[in-house]
Amino acid sequence: LPRIDQIINAAAEHDSLCFLDAYSGYHQIKMAESDQAATTFITPYGPFCFNTMPFGLKNAGATYQHMIQTCLEKQISKTVEAYVDDMVIKTRHVETLIDDLRLTFGNLRTYDIKLNPEKCIFGVPSGKLLGFIVSNRGIEANPAKIRALLQLDIPADLKHIQKLAGCMAALSCFISRLGEKALLLYRLLWRTEHFVWTDAAAAGLDEINTLLASNPVLIGPNIGEPMLLYIAATHQVVSAVLVIEREVDGYKFPLQNPVYYVSTVL
């Protein structure tokens, strides 16, 4: 399967987006007659088997991905990105949207792939894709994930800290020097006894919440575009960020835009 981060980067910073949903997903792929018996299941009315690919098969996702990439081969990485049954048509200029749609629909029709119109969205400036928000601004965190973190109660035990750490991990690429800000929180994960929530730990969490509430935005690099790597290291934490410099109208010097943050507690 493709890397999710590559799909997200490629879909961001476009003027218009169309999100497509295939009708019944995997069931649009027919099973080979010789393999149908392997999908047999028992019901009160006797045994039945699938004649189309069911959900749950080990290679179902990869098989569906292969079908979509074959169908949209000439558009993948150009005007279309696809991750299994999540497809997005990306248009740099609104004027070419209809042409991009016409080409995509023609390719889907060639392979008899049907879409669910109730779940398709056309010509929008932003939308949710694979757990992120992509728009012409760049890549933003899913607001639902941010709300989940902001609404967590003050941790009272190890289980609560583990839940908090999980929420932060899902948003880590948006948080500068996360390891330093959350160091005291991570240390609580190592303790099995004498759990104590301190003011210093609360201050670190407040700093993270404030940063996320500001709606940070990442951008995706273009092929061949130079990037800068900044590293900050202490004896406890190593943090880094990939940055791209781009010229912006009205500014004398190029602006630095973050691509991805990483942080590791030693």
Enumerate the predicted regions with their spans.
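Acidic, metal-ligating active-site segments
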Residues: T234-G250
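A short acidic-Thr-Gly-centered motif at the start of a beta-strand
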Residues: R3-S16, P216-I223
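C-terminal reverse transcriptase regions that engage the nucleic-acid substrate
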Residues: K78, Y83, E118-E225
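Amphipathic alpha-helical blocks
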Residues: I8-P44, L115-P117, H160-L184, A233-H235
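Active-site palm subdomain of RNA-directed nucleic acid polymerases
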Residues: G61-D99, F174, L178
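A short, polar/acidic, helix/strand-boundary loop motif
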Residues: Y45-T63, V248-L266
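Hydrophobic (often cysteine-bearing) scaffold residues that line and stabilize catalytic clefts
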Residues: I4, F19, A60-Y64, V80, ...
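Mobile genetic element proteins and their domesticated derivatives, centered on retroelements
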Residues: I7, D21, F41, G56, ...
